[in-house]
UniProtKB/Swiss-Prot annotation:
Heme b b566 binds at residues 98, 197. InterPro entries: Cyt_b/b6_C, Cyt_b/b6_C_sf, Cyt_b/b6_N, Cytb/b6-like_sf, Cytochrome_b, Cytochrome_b_C_euk/bac, Cytochrome_b_N_euk/bac, Di-haem_cyt_TM. The chain crosses the membrane at residues 34-54, 78-99, 114-134, 179-199, 227-247, 289-309, 321-341, 348-368. The keyword Transmembrane applies. This is Cytochrome b. Keywords: Electron transport, Heme, Iron, Membrane, Metal-binding, Mitochondrion, Mitochondrion inner membrane, Respiratory chain, Transmembrane, Transmembrane helix, Transport, Ubiquinone. It comes from Aquarana catesbeiana. Heme b b562 binds at residues 84, 183. GO terms for biological process: mitochondrial electron transport, ubiquinol to cytochrome c. Signal peptide: none annotated. It comes from the Eukaryota.
Length: 380
């Protein structure tokens, strides 16, 4: 019998092993869709971004008007711009659900896959930050100034580092040009890192909701999960299209419709909604260096998850006490997101400090101690 081409061709057999004949646990459900949704988001962002880059001008005197030109004069430019801006929000919605699922079902015990995933999160955040500067509106300019200025908190090299990133003594033309360069190249680095992420995942196979070994009960990825993922694509792309056409500016900041002016500070400088939880943690510490370290640690704490897992059970499905504190962490992160969007005054600062303390308390102390407690209660 002639060999099947998808199993014998050097290139097709890699695709076949990753997306067609891949043995997958039979009990995966909707929470496992978000990895593929992130792939769709990345492709959508690269495609819309390439078309926008054809018409965008990375110059302080032309950037804002080039965005207006895209929206007014370019054929379907308004749609491209709205899809790209709101696509970033959907990207972060999917990435946070993906991380949440990993925390809930113990996916972080696949250490290499998890660590590459956290690096990917940093890359996506960096891409979103430099991208937000490109329209050169008020919030773009002041957001770039405030966030890059945080690097001056680094001992000895801080002020030199900031000027090196700015390309001068303030956020100006050189800054915008290099930020555009980074925004263009980073998605391709993310795509390469995503392939490494998948490579490590396929070494171990996917986890499943029970956290048990699923080698006895596996099905091929296609057609079962490929169609399930396709259903997710339709829902997400439908939601993205609806938001981009009916309420395109819902998640944006009104200040960004004003051209950047270094002489006028906006009344309340804040990043996009997906960074607000980290911004609230940064703002909750009065010391500049302490705030920057807390900001970094709020994401880097994810690297510790495989180390601080003390439970003999993998998934939270069978851990009622730890499950309660997982949802407390989700609620706490939602409170931090709300606080990050509020003015820097009481009672918001106090609430932010309490929520920031709880955030680190859950990660650093409660997760390992609850694992040990449950082992003792279950006598395992």
């Amino acid at each position: 019998m002639a060999p099947t081409m998808r199993k014998s061709h050097p290139l097709l057999k890699i695709i076949n092993g990753s997306f067609i004949d891949l043995p997958s646990p039979a009990n995966l459900w909707a929470w496992w869709n978000f990895g593929s949704l992130l792939g769709v988001c990345l492709v959508a962002q690269i495609v819309t971004g390439l078309f926008l880059a054809m018409h965008y001008t990375a110059d302080t005197s032309l950037a804002f008007s080039s965005i207006a030109h895209i929206c007014r004069d370019v054929n379907n430019g308004w749609l491209l711009r709205n899809l790209h801006a709101n696509g970033a929000s959907f990207f972060f919605i999917c990435i946070y659900f993906h991380i949440g699922r990993g925390l809930y079902y113990g996916s972080y015990l696949y250490k290499e896959t998890w660590n590459i995933g956290v690096i990917l999160l940093f890359l996506v955040m960096a891409t979103a930050f430099v991208g937000y500067v490109l329209p050169w509106g008020q919030m773009s300019f002041w957001g770039a100034t405030v966030i890059t200025n945080l690097l001056s908190a680094a001992p000895y090299i801080g002020s030199d580092l900031v000027q090196w990133i700015w390309g001068g003594f303030s956020v100006d033309n050189a800054t915008l040009t290099r930020f555009f360069t980074f925004h263009f190249i980073l998605p391709f680095i993310i795509a390469a890192a995503s392939m490494i992420h998948l490579l490590f995942l396929h070494q171990t196979g996917s986890s499943n909701p029970t956290g048990l070994n699923s080698n006895l009960d596996k099905v091929s990825f296609h057609p079962y999960f490929s169609y399930k993922d396709l259903f997710g694509f339709v829902i997400m792309l439908g939601a993205l299209a609806s938001l981009s056409t009916f309420a395109p500016n819902l998640l944006g900041d009104p200040d960004n419709f004003t051209p950047a002016n270094p002489l006028v500070t906006p009344p309340h400088i804040k990043p996009e909604w997906y960074f607000l939880f980290a911004y609230a943690i940064l703002r909750s510490i009065p010391n500049k260096l302490g705030g920057v370290l807390a900001l970094l640690l709020s994401i880097m704490v994810l690297f510790r998850m495989p180390i601080i897992h003390t439970s003999k059970l993998r998934s939270l499905m069978f851990r009622p006490i730890a499950k309660t504190f997982f949802w407390a962490l989700i609620a706490n992160t939602a409170i931090l997101t709300w606080i990050g969007g509020q003015p820097g005054e009481d009672p918001f600062i106090t609430i932010g400090q309490i929520a920031s303390g709880l955030y680190f308390l859950i990660f650093v102390l409660l997760i390992p101690s609850l694992g040990l407690l449950e082992n003792k209660l279950l006598k395992i």
